[in-house]
């Protein structure tokens, strides 16, 4: 076994913290913002603990200057925050909301003033409710163009000051909890075929947004983040080892391979095809996924736990 003495973290390592718009901002219906799917979902009895909502949260929308000052005192070098799509485009598309753009612009400037690098997450699960009402959100291919339009608006507005971008936060979580477990909007249970099609639409939104950013700002750093849980076989028995391989193909590499290589794991796709739940591709999708994968700069990994497979 080889041991090497640690030299510590690099001096330019970005120690920081992160948040999600719905979890911290509050101001859920102020300055032109319209409801997101979470604003509606939390009002369904039994969906949240003691019917709690993010209507006020920690009031970051009004307290951001104080929050940033405290971040500076903590010594944070970076702050990753998400943007509420329905604060920028209240209806998900159509008319842009200048008040929403101004809020995030002021937040970015305040961070920079305090020597904190802003990292923007474009999507942390708060789809505009208007798009859910118009065409069922991520279930419809139209979501791709609406998302890229939203993303491009942000790139053009903030790209001169923001270098680091995350397109989607934990795609595997918001799709799994939304279409398989009914824990998140839209609250569907074991809708497997829709689940895989929703993921394909999300991959296309990710890929086209990556390409849009690189066209505007070639030196920007971009990727998506993924909730990765390493899997370990419970024994060295061949059947347990193969079960672990299959699990990782369907629960991890199904996302990571698309981000990194621009293609789905072959064995996973064969399995989904045998079940009749493989996603539908439009002409050119495979090429777009491949091109975007060649231009991503990183993959964010959110690590919670491991799992044992048999």
Residue ranges and their predicted role:
Residues 12-14, 61, 78:
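A common structural microfeature
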Residues 83-96:
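Glycine-rich, proline-tolerant flexible connector loops at the mouths of alpha/beta enzymes
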Residues 60-67, 90, 100:
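Internal amphipathic alpha-helical repeat/solenoid segments
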Residues 55-56, 95-96, 198:
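A generic structural signal for short
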Residues 63-84, 117, 294, 298-299:
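Catalytic domains of carbohydrate-active enzymes, especially glycoside hydrolases
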Residues 49-63, 139-141:
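Active-site mouth loops of central-metabolism enzymes
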Residues 2-48, 72, 91-93, 101-310:
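Active-site region of glycoside hydrolase catalytic domains
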């Amino acid at each position: 076994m080889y041991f090497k003495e640690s030299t510590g973290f690099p001096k330019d390592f970005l120690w920081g913290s992160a948040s999600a718009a719905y979890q911290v901002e509050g101001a859920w219906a102020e300055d032109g913002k319209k409801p997101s799917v979470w604003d509606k979902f939390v009002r369904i009895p039994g969906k949240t603990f003691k019917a709690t909502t993010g209507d006020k949260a920690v009031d970051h929308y009004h307290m951001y200057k104080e929050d940033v000052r405290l971040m500076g005192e903590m010594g944070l070098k970076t702050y990753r925050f998400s943007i509420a799509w329905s604060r920028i485009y209240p209806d998900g598309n159509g008319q842009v909301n200048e008040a929403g753009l101004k809020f995030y612009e002021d937040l970015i400037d305040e961070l920079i003033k305090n020597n904190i690098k802003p990292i923007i997450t474009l999507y942390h699960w708060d789809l505009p409710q208007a798009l859910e009402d118009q065409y069922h959100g991520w279930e419809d291919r139209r979501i791709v163009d609406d998302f890229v339009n939203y993303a491009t608006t942000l790139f053009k507005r903030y790209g001169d000051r923001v270098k680091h971008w995350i397109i989607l936060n934990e795609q595997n979580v918001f799709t799994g909890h939304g279409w398989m477990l009914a824990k998140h909007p839209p609250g569907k249970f074991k809708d497997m075929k829709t689940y895989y099609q929703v993921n394909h639409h999300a991959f296309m939104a990710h890929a086209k947004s990556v390409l849009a950013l690189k066209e505007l700002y070639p030196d920007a750093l971009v990727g998506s983040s993924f909730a990765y849980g390493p899997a370990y076989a419970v024994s060295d028995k061949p059947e347990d080892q193969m079960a672990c391989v299959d699990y990782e193909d369907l629960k991890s590499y199904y996302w990571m391979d698309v981000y990194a290589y621009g293609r789905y794991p072959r064995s996973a796709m064969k399995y989904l095809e045998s079940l009749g739940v493989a996603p539908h591709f439009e002409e050119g999708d495979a090429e777009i996924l491949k091109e975007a994968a060649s231009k991503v700069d990183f993959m964010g990994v959110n690590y919670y736990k491991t799992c044992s497979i048999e």
